[in-house]
Each structure stands twice: as C-alpha cells, then as structure tokens.
Amino acid sequence: MFFNSLLTNFAALEVGQHLYWQIGNIRLHGQVFLTSWILLGALLVFISLGTKKMENDPKGLQNLLEFLWDYIRDLARTQIGEKVYRDWMPFIGTLFLFVFVSNWGGALIPWRLIKLPSGELGAPTADINTTIALALLVSLSYFYAGLSNKGWRYFEYYVHPTPIMLPFKILEDFTKPLSLSFRLFGNILADELVVGVLVFLVPLILPIPVMFLGLFTSAIQALIFATLAAYYIGEAVEEHH
C-alpha cells in the first residue's frame, strides 16, 4: 500500500502550471504547442529573410545561415559518414535548430508576461513530453537508417561481436532515448528554475550572468542532442566486420 501510494504521488507531481487542451480522452499541454508554434514561426521568418536574396558574396543573415549549414554538414559527415550523410542533413539540422531556438527562446523571452487563462508559457524543451517525443523520433530514425541501408542484416548489430551482447544491445535501445530526453529536459528546466528564483530574490544584477551561463548551456545542449542523434544514425548504418 505504501509503495502504491508513493508511486501515485510521484505520478501526480507537476513542475509549474499548465494550460491543458482536452481532445477527446487525450489531455495535451497547450502551452508547449503555443510556444513551439511561435518559435517555429520566428525561425521560418528568420530563414526566409536570410534566403530571400541569395548573393555570391554572402552578408548578414545569409552569411549566418551558410555558416550554420556548413557546421551541420560537417557534423553530419563526421558522425554519419561520407556515404549517406547528405540524406540526413535536413533531419539533423532541423533537430539542432528546433532545440537551439526552443532553449534560447526559454532563456531570452519573458514568457511569463503573457497571461493565459491558466498555466504559463515557457521553453518547449523544459517540458518532458517534448524531449521524450524528440528522443523517440531519434530512435525511430536510426532504426529506419539501419533497416533502409542494410535490410535485415541490421539486426546483426545486436549479436556483434558475440551473441552475449544481445541483452545489452536491447537494453541500450531503451536507455538511449531516456538519456537523450532527461538530459535535455533536466538542464533546461533547471536553468529556468534557477533564473526564476534569482530574479525573485535579487531582481537587478545577479540573474544577468546566470542568464548568460544559461544561454551557453542551452547552445551546448542543442549541439549535444544533434551530435548524439547523428552518432546513433551513423552507428546504425556502419558496416560491422
């Protein structure tokens, strides 16, 4: 009885206040969709402005976008390999940009000034549902990469170099999305909570360096997420001898 009660209490725990949307029997965190749509819209506008008038000598936004393109290309080539990295560049780039914009949007935009009927806005990546969805998407992607490149030979990976590795490789398929999701969620949520507490206690000077540290951490977390996603895909398409 004690353990059942304890587990029930943990399941009922919530961090922050939420705006819920009820669709049939499904209850969604509405604030996550709102902030995601706002940030994705801003990202699309940013990319549209940067690619509106392409020039041979890039300047301004075009220069920044080309830098990001080259960076993502090098990351994908390094982690996935020369053979198929081009096929996965759009996916890795989209992951990186979404996580990066979500993290920085949570750190820079004063979402709490926007009043809702209930709940409060915040970084999409500070919600565990978002990070789990992203992590599961990565898992499905590397399964697809392995099967599309190797067919049924992909499953040889689970018994390479010895069949003893089978249970460990299966367990690894569960731990990969868990580590991806909880690492990103924990870091971004912790940053939001620390900044929120400091703004409440010392509202003038102290939160500023912490916010800059949060921006740096947010960028690093986006890079780690995209790099690990590319690495897992590269691992799936790699030929084992």
From Swiss-Prot:
Membrane topology: Multi-pass membrane protein
Transmembrane feature ranges: 30-50, 91-111, 128-148, 193-213, 214-234
Main localisation: membrane
InterPro entries xref list: ATP_syn_F0_a_bact/chloroplast, ATP_synth_F0_asu, ATP_synth_F0_asu_AS, F0_ATP_A_sf
Top-level division of the source organism's lineage: Bacteria
The keyword Transport is assigned to this record: yes
A cellular component term, taken from the record's GO annotations: plasma membrane-derived thylakoid membrane
One function term, GO molecular function aspect: proton-transporting ATP synthase activity, rotational mechanism
Entry keywords, A to Z: ATP synthesis, CF(0), Hydrogen ion transport, Ion transport, Membrane, Thylakoid, Transmembrane, Transmembrane helix, Transport
Localisation per UniProt entry: Cellular thylakoid membrane
Entry annotated with the keyword Metal-binding: no
PANTHER family membership: ATP SYNTHASE SUBUNIT A, CHLOROPLASTIC
Role summary: Key component of the proton channel; it plays a direct role in the translocation of protons across the membrane.
Subunit structure: F-type ATPases have 2 components, CF(1) - the catalytic core - and CF(0) - the membrane proton channel. CF(1) has five subunits: alpha(3), beta(3), gamma(1), delta(1), epsilon(1). CF(0) has four main subunits: a, b, b' and c.
Record-linked HAMAP family: ATP_synth_a_bact
Protein family: Belongs to the ATPase A chain family.
Name of this protein: ATP synthase subunit a
Species: Prochlorococcus marinus (strain MIT 9301)
The organism's taxonomic lineage, starting at the top: Bacteria, Bacillati, Cyanobacteriota, Cyanophyceae, Synechococcales
